[in-house]
Curated annotation (Swiss-Prot):
UniProt organism field: Halothermothrix orenii (strain H 168 / OCM 544 / DSM 9562)
Function noted in UniProt: Catalyzes the condensation of ATP and 5-phosphoribose 1-diphosphate to form N'-(5'-phosphoribosyl)-ATP (PR-ATP). Has a crucial role in the pathway because the rate of histidine biosynthesis seems to be controlled primarily by regulation of HisG enzymatic activity.
Entry's Gene Ontology cellular component terms: cytoplasm
Metabolic or biological pathway, per its Swiss-Prot or TrEMBL entry: Amino-acid biosynthesis; L-histidine biosynthesis; L-histidine from 5-phospho-alpha-D-ribose 1-diphosphate: step 1/9
Name by which UniProt lists this protein: ATP phosphoribosyltransferase
Gene for this chain: hisG
Amino acid sequence: MKSVITALPKGRLMGEVIDILKQSGFISNNIDINTLSRQLVFHDKKTRNSFLLAKPKDVPVYVEHGAADLGITGKDVLLEHGRNLYEMVDLGVGKCKLVVAVPESKGYKSLADIPEYSRVATSYPEIVKKFFQGKGIQVEVIKLNGSVELAPLVDLADVIVDISSTGTTLKKNNLIPMETIVTSSARLVVNNVSYKIKHKQISELINKINEVVKSGNTEISRK
């Protein structure tokens, strides 16, 4: 029986994701997260499952191209990159919001106050383009790979769209959240071909993870 290969997200999601996988028997309880986080590829001899560790934005790429059978990443990542994958489970962890935020000094009260052709800094250009097009607002989207909240401070952008969990970072930088574009949480996705070839194995694993999520041991976030 071939092992199931899962792409796991490095960073803030990893700890909560590993907890769920341990509870579901997907990964051994004796596996140390600190040891695991330093590896790129890991095989769990007890469960016979294999894991790849990748940046959250790269997880869908590994799954779509068949390097991994399963993957776990945020809904925000899936929406931005639009990969052809089956989304199987909302793990209910890693909850955050993708929000439109503006400097307090601008005095904007709503999206309607944002001038045409304002510059919007974000790590999610595709989501942002669709959002503002849907609102009928013409903007210039500037893609950044991190520290998006810096953009208004140096006059690179008038508006930002960024992930916010608690709102603390926005507040520290005098940014006011104006509107939520999407609420995100960690999702389990599967490669379309793998789901057919390894259907029994993958279905059993998904069912176990679903049981843990529905048991209340992890907080459930609705789609």
